[in-house]
Amino acid sequence: MAELLIKSVGETDPNYGCNPNERPIKEHISNGVVNLDKPIGPTSHEVDAWMKRLLHVEKTGHGGTLDPKVSGVLPIGINRSTRVIQMLLGAPKEYVCLMRLHEKISETRIRDILQEFTGKIFQTPPIKSAVKRELRVRTIYNVDLLEIDGQDVLFRINCEGGTYIRKYCHDIGEALGIGAHMAELRRTKSGPFTEDETLKTLQDLTDAYYYLTQENNEKPIRECILPMEAAVKHLKKIVVRDSAVDSICHGADLASNGILELSPDIKLGETVRVLTIKGELVGAGETVENSDGILKSNKGIMVNIKKVFMEPETYPKMWK
């Protein structure tokens, strides 16, 4: 992680807010996200509903739907965090795909076509998709060929959110003139969530909830449910003064004098996360200056706040 640029120095009042990892357990669950390893079989919405019943919460929601036959990383938000999870919809994704060619061809042709289908591509969503079927541009960041076994081609693909891998395989088959289809698919990354130690199964969550409710052991559930802040770790950040927090929670944009620290290399118009000194997520917005401009500014709005995630009055009102 790049070292933050210091614009100003400030202190935080320990009487307000808290470190995201130290929230009381009820608040931790209600503001939490789960990096779930979705199994093959249920729909993403069925998994949401199952988690809602298990945890006895009001609301659950996922970021980036996986089809029933697809497994892997499915981030799920709980209660207030369902709004944070929506920030993942456009985030980069990674998949491991098994594509089945309808005829056997040379490895050279396979490598060439994967190279051809890297960069900007055109896609029309499949007939069964939940979105309007319009031609759209998607970016394929890179494709790694992992293995070829006869007509089966295993590859890893990093792509823009909203890319349809099933359609990607179909279009490759069309371009080759032999036909192809997606045989198996697993998502290995969604924004900041990967197949690391935070990835948990439905059984892990069931066991953790048992330990919490029957043995008063919080540790397993805290390992399964992450603070909402985990869902936006892929975004660059701006740290603000305590005095700026409540005004943002009431709809104000972020002014220059409220900023303490910021990530380097922030671009004009980039979506950033806005955090307290303690590391709590206040909201997210679009910058009106780059890092250098923000650092040198003495006045004016620096971030147009688009989403607020923190409850008002978590920090004291210091604005008029």
What is each PLM-predicted segment?
Residues 1-62, 130-135, 152, 175, ...:
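Accessory RNA 3′-end/elbow-binding domains used by RNA modification enzymes
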Residues 52-57, 90, 115-120, 170-178:
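Short, intrinsically disordered, mixed-charge
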Residues 55, 59-88:
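Glycine/acidic-rich beta-strand-loop module
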Residues 64-73, 92-94, 126-133:
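Short, glycine/charge-rich beta-strand/loop segments that flank catalytic centers
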Residues 76, 97, 168, 248, ...:
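Residue-level signal for inorganic ion chemistry
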Residues 80, 99-103, 144-147, 157-161, ...:
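Short, structured patches in soluble enzyme cores that scaffold and shape functional sites
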Residues 81-129, 149:
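Acidic, low-complexity central loop/insert segments
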Residues 131-162, 166-176:
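The conserved catalytic core of RNA pseudouridine synthases
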